[in-house]
Structures are given as C-alpha cells and as structure tokens.
Amino acid sequence: MEESKELQGFYKIFRTVVYVSVLLEFFEYAIDPAMLDHWGGILTDIHGRIKQWMIYHDGNLVYSKIATVLLICITCVGTRNKKHLEFNARRQVVYPLTSGLLLLVLSVWLFGHTMETRLYTLPLNIILYMIASIAGVVLVHIALDNISKFIKEGLMKDRFNFENESFEQCEEKVENEYSVNIPMRYYYKGKFRKGWISVSNCFRGTWVVGTPGSGKTFSIIEPFIRQHSAKGFAMVVYDYKFPTLATKLYYHYKKNEKLGRVPQGCKFNMINFVDVEYSRRVNPIQAKYINNLAAASETAETLLESLQKGKKEGGGGSDQFFQTSAVNFLAACIYFFVNYEREPYDANGKPLYAERQQDPQTKFWKPTGIVRDREGGNIVEPAYWLGKYSDMPHILSFLNESYQTIFEVLETDNEVAPLLGPFQTAFKNKAMEQLEGMIGTLRVYTSRLATKESYWIFHRDGDDFDLKVSDPKNPSYLLIANDPEMESIIGALNALILNRLVTRVNTGQGKNIPVSIIVDELPTLYFHKIDRLIGTARSNKVSVTLGFQNLPQLEADYGKVGMQKIITTVGNVVSGSARAKETLEWLSNDIFGKVVQVKKGVTIDRDKTSINLNENMDNLVPASKISDMATGWICGQTARDFVKTKTGMGGSMNIQESEEFKTTKFFCKTDFDMAEIKKEEAAYVPLPKFYTFKSREERERILYKNFVQVGQDVKEMIKDVQNKRNAK
C-alpha cells in the first residue's frame, strides 16, 4: 500500500505539471509584456527568462501545444484507473481525443487572428484561444486517461475457449499401401491450417459415428471405398439405401479395372433381395462354408440372433434355454441338409464320382472318402462337396413340416441325432408347450424369410461366386444391398451371407488379398461376433469400417455387451456431430481426454486490477463442442503404429517433440477437391443386371415356379427317407 500511495502522489505531480504548462503558455503568449511592468520588473524578468526556453524561443505556439500533449501522454502512461468491463472505445477515447485535438488546432488559429473586441483589456480572440486551449487539453487528457480503463488481457475475447481447445494436428501425409488419407483443415493459433487424417493401419478397425446429415458417409465411408479400391483391395460394401453406395463402388471397380489396379481376375457381384435382376445367386449353406457341426451352430445362431435383433439381452435362465434349444434345432437341420446325399465337384463345378458303402445301422449309403474322376476313374481330390438339397430354401421349407416328420428325417443322420434328444423326449411325452417354446419360436421367425426372392438367390443351383472374396485365385467385389422398407427380413438374410463370408476371408495365413469390409448403418445389419473379426483378422489383412449414428442406437440392436465389445475393440475412431449423451461422454472423456490448459483470471477492485494465470486439466474437446459441429467437421483419433524410440545422450528425450508421443487426435473440417468429386459423380455408369427377364410377369412366374419346386423337393426327400427307413 505504501508503494501505491507514493506512485499515486507521483502521478498527481505529473498531472499538475500538465496544467502548469498550459498556464505558462498563457503567461507567455496571452498576456502583453507591457502589462507585467509591476513589482520592479520582476514579472517582466521572469517572462523574459521563460521566453528563452526551447518551446517558447521563436514565438511559435505550435511547439508549446506539442509539449503539452507530450506531457499528457507521459502522464497517462502511468495512470492506473479502475478497469471498465463495458469499455466503449469510441465514446471514451476516439470522440474526446478527436474533439480535444481539434480544439487545440482551433486555439492556434484563434491566437493568430486578431479581433478588435476586448474584454478586460484582452482581445476576444485571446480569450477564445484560452478557452479552446483549456477545453482541448482537458479532453485530450480524459481520452488518453480512459485508455487505462481498457482491460488489455482479452477478457471475454475467447468466449467459447477456442484457443485452449485447439491443438496442433498432423500436417504430414502418412501413406502406405493400405492407408486411407483424408485431406482436412484445422484451426490453431489464429490460422486455418492444412493437414491430413492418416488411417495408416486400417486393419485395426474403424468406426464412424454421427447424426444423420453430419457427413460421416461423405467424409469417411466414401474415401475408404475410393482409396481401398485404388490400392487393390477386394471390397465388401453394405448398402442400406441401395443404390447409394452401389453406384460409387461399381464406378471405382470399372475405373480401377481399366487402370490395372484391381486384383487380377476380380469380378463385381451384388446381392439384392428386392430387385433380383441386380443380384447374383449364392449358396452359403454348403460344405465348403459349413464343414462341421460347430460351423452349423454358428450359422444358426447368426440367423436367429439377426431375426431377434435387440431382444437378446434381459432374459432369464428359461429364455436362455429356449434360445439355445432353437439354435441347436436349426443347426441340426442345417447340418443334415449339408450332408444329405452330398456329391463331390472339381474346381470348375464338374461332378465327380464318390465311392459309397451302406451304413449298417441306418442302411443309408455313406461316402467312403474315395473320389474318382468320372471319365478316367482316377482318384482325385474334390474342390468341394454339395448336398442334394444343401441350401437355405430347402431348410426353410423343411421347417414347416410336422414335428414327427422332421424328427424321423433328422435322426437318420448319426451326427445330428444327439442334438435331437431333448426335442424327441418332449414330443414323446406330449409336452407340446415345451416343444413349441423350443422350436415354435424358431419356426415363426424363419417363416418370415421364406420369400420367392430369397428362395431364388439362395438356391443351390445358382451358386454364382465364392464368398471368399479375398481368394487370390478368384477375388471379387461384393455389394450387399438392403431396403429400408424390408430392413429386418433382408438384414437377416444378409447377416447369413456376411457370417459365412467373414469365416472364409479370415483364413489363409496372410496369403489373401487385402479385403475392406465397409458396413454403413451397422444397426440395420446383424454382424455376428464382429469384435472377434476385428481382433483376429489383422494377419489376414481384413479392414473393417463400421458406421452408425450413436451408441444407444447400437446398444438397442446389439445389446450393451455387444456395443461395448465393438467400440472397445476398434482402433480408429471418427465422429461427426453427435447428440446422445453416452456418445458425447465417450468421445469427450475416453477418446480426447483432458489436457493442461492455461486459464486467465481478472480481479478488479477500486484500487487495482489483478491478472492471474492458472494451469489446470480440462477436456480437450468438450461434449458441447462435438454436438455443435457443422456438416463436414469431424473429430476422433487414429490408431498408432509401432515407432522406434529415439533418445539422446544418456537416454535424454524431449518428450514434447518425440514422434512417439505426438497426438493422433484430430478436430477438423474435411477438405476434398469438390470439382473432382462432381466430375466423378457425373461419370457414374448404370449398375449391371446379372439376370434378365422379359417382363415383370415372367420374373414373378420364374420365381414362383422355383418357390414351388423347393417345396416339392422337400416332399420327395421326406418320402425317400421314409421309404429307406421302412425298408430296414
């Protein structure tokens, strides 16, 4: 306080000097020296001595004014006024300063223009000159003094804390043979800088979250399609709103095929259960995809869970019993049809001859394992085996038969028979309620899948391509289409395809072609055990990209445990604008976390203003900032690869500059070449039709004929099995 009083006294002295200089100016210029001839000439002598000073020496009034203004400036430099939060620079500085300077100029003009009118021996122009000088000095003093009331520390300047929450991001394009690189721009230290989002290890999985219209498909999904296609990946793309992504995928397939970038011999395939003209036919229920009972059980579980999507969790022990029973029963049916009268085929689909012997218990003929060429009779190794009715349509039709008929047929297979014990016991004891609980629910669900279109596409006679799309000998692109109006039914059928496809591509000991599996709108498709695929498929070069809108949506269809498995297994995380609380908290707290931020505090009292700077940990990107992102803005984090640790002398390390500790987080706006994208969209070509029908009526007739034929096949099979049983 003592120092403050001394300084205040010092400032008062300077203020006094300012106005003393004004009085001295009046003394020198406004008063006639002849009027000072009093007291023995003392005043005249003082006047003469002051006249010798530099600012008064040549009688130029301008120098005196300049000196006064300089004194005001020096005085105001040390002024400590109380700060004003609502500081108005125009009203408090500009206007009074301008007025004051104009009055000082006016005073000089008035001094040089003589007026005859006098007041108390002083000419009127001198009186006006003095008034203008005093008013001008006061206004200039007030204006410059008010500058000190301005809070220079930028209070309220960064209202939304943009500076503290901005950070330096990757500006270097990190590219390799598998990477996806997305150009972007980000704000940091007053500049909108250019940079790159480099997903250098896509095999660790990527998920993209964002509300509808946030730009997640345009910003992330489409670049993955574009760049992975150009880098020779086999592609599997799920198109919820066919043909939105289908046209893009086909365009890049044709483009890169011409440029020689797609794998050699790569074909383009689509699965579409609505417009079957645009669909290949595929049979996921056959021995090359289901080679044991465990695979049949997993296929059954996938199909049932996709039909019951969102209803898996929350049941008690009895619910779990009925769920497991339904899976076992469907698995028994699948495995029976896979093996029923199966025949060997070579790689070209040509039938071979399999030697058989009669089973002494069932009296059915079973393959011995020896396969011969039909032409030369030479022993050969078959490429695959195919059951006589090994497909999903025949299984769905078979499930509509009576319980007694089903049990009589299934128990003829020794491998399947053990699974039938609980069902046969319930049937023999006439516990029909229990049996309906075990099987009836399954039949209700699967009956929804029995459509003409599904029977056509899944029929064994139309197996157009292999689901191992990453096979170097027979690679392919696969577009899996859905329709919002039939989402649940088509989603279950697509889940069956995807389940068997994933099993195939996740083999090969690293010799496969890299494959990119892209599923936008993930909750509309049940992706069975997706966390295991992401966690184990890196060695087989399987890239998985998943898009959804928010975590509660994912939880509703996959359950809480399933959701946690997905979001915690994936390495690359990207988000557009989000709204759900769970999503925002996950991103803000677990992905971005907290960083050290400098917080500035200003304390204003009547005597002084204090500025405090504090360091504390706070959210790098708060939830409110993520929810407020505009379309095209994305944030997230990419997975790190191994980086060799570099140290200096004695193991020293500058951790702030070390490559190993640089952040891979980003908060930015995508920066695509829109002209190039529009040019690409203008070059899209029509999607191919794989089957041609003369008319819609002909298509319906062919599909219906196939539908009826499946039912007849099942009836014939049952009759044949029963005849063989009776022959025993």
Model-derived features: positions:
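Hydrophobic alpha-helical segments involved in membrane association or supramolecular assembly
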Residues: 100, 491-499, 572, 617
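N-terminal structured subdomain of primase-like DNA metabolism proteins
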Residues: 28, 649-651
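Basic- and hydrophobic-enriched, low-structure N-terminal and domain-boundary segments
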Residues: 1-214, 218, 223, 231, ...
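C-terminal nuclease/phosphodiesterase catalytic domains that cleave nucleic-acid phosphodiester bonds
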Residues: 616, 647-648
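Conserved ATP-driven motor cores of ASCE-family P-loop NTPases powering translocation/secretion/packaging/pilus
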Residues: 534-536, 540-543, 547-638, 724
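P-loop NTPase motor domains
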Residues: 25, 148, 152-156, 199-542, ...
